[in-house]
A protein has these predicted regions:
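FAD-site-proximal beta/loop scaffold in flavoenzymes
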Residues: 2, 27-100, 107, 205
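Conserved beta-strand termini and adjacent loop/short-helix elements that scaffold enzyme active sites
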Residues: 5-7, 58, 143-145
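Short, surface-exposed charged micro-motifs
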Residues: 10, 52, 66, 164-166
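Short, hydrophobic/aromatic-rich segments at coil-to-beta transitions
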Residues: 16-19, 139-140
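Short beta-strand and adjoining strand-loop segment in the mid-core
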Residues: 19, 79-86, 116-123
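Glycine-centered tight beta-turn/hairpin loop motif at sheet-sheet or coil-to-beta transitions
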Residues: 23-25
Length: 232
């Protein structure tokens, strides 16, 4: 049963689960409680006002392309600035900020930042989505390859899922890669590298991949995007 428009006022751990108290006095008994309400920037205790800084309407600290705030010698990174709240995104921003402090340059390619949902099967993505490409009027082509056609996936008993490669319809440059399946978060690390170095679907499709491995699914999807599929 899915209930909407309900406000939880308290969750109390008990010996055999938890008691969930709702607004209005209703109480639910649960075996497990999953907290999935999203996150928000947390800047309490940073004394931003003392530094002459403030947050935007979403609680984030505004920064420029070099992660500098409006106070030039103060930088901000991670969950308190724009972009996805991902640890590896924050790490890249930290490196870029320090590079800018030391050398006067520093850059993060946000299109090459992968995101992974660690469910079973995993879900992962990097780069543009089809919806974003359509909204921007960018012509693209799609290549897909299923886990069910992978020898390694079949040997693992993990045949559910696929990987999809989006490439520019004219230049063949990879624009986005999305997938669902076993270890797809690991497989898409190569896709992030491809986006970072502006590789084409042909580049990724021609690169040798070990057999049998899950990485072959990405190779085959790239070949399909290049419009030269082999094993499907």
């Amino acid at each position: 049963t899915i209930r909407t428009g309900v406000r939880v006022t308290a969750v109390v751990p008990e010996a055999k689960g938890a008691r969930v108290e709702l607004e209005g006095g209703e109480v639910l008994e649960a075996d497990r409680v999953l907290v999935a309400v999203g996150r928000r920037p947390y800047t309490e205790g940073l004394s931003l006002e003392n530094a002459g800084l403030s947050t935007d309407e979403r609680g984030r600290i505004p920064v420029d392309e070099h992660l500098r705030t409006r106070v030039p010698h103060i930088y901000a990174i991670g969950d308190v600035v724009r972009g996805p709240m991902l640890a590896h995104k924050a790490s890249e921003e930290g490196i870029a900020a320090v590079e800018h402090m030391a050398r006067g340059f520093g850059h993060v390619d946000y299109q090459a930042i992968p995101s992974v949902v660690y469910t079973h099967p995993e879900i992962a993505a990097v780069g543009y989505t089809e919806e974003e490409l359509k909204a921007q009027g960018i012509p693209y082509k799609v290549g897909k390859f299923p886990y069910s056609a992978s020898g390694r996936a079949r040997a693992m008993g993990e045949t559910e899922g696929f990987i999809k490669v989006l490439a520019h319809a004219k230049t063949d440059r990879i624009l986005g890669v999305h997938g669902i399946g076993a270890r797809v978060g690991d497989v898409l690390a190569e896709a992030a590298l491809a986006l970072f170095f502006k590789a084409s679907a042909e580049d990724l499709g021609r690169a040798p991949h070990a057999h049998p491995s899950l990485s072959e699914i990405l190779k085959e999807a790239a070949l399909a995007a290049w419009e030269r599929p082999i094993h499907l």
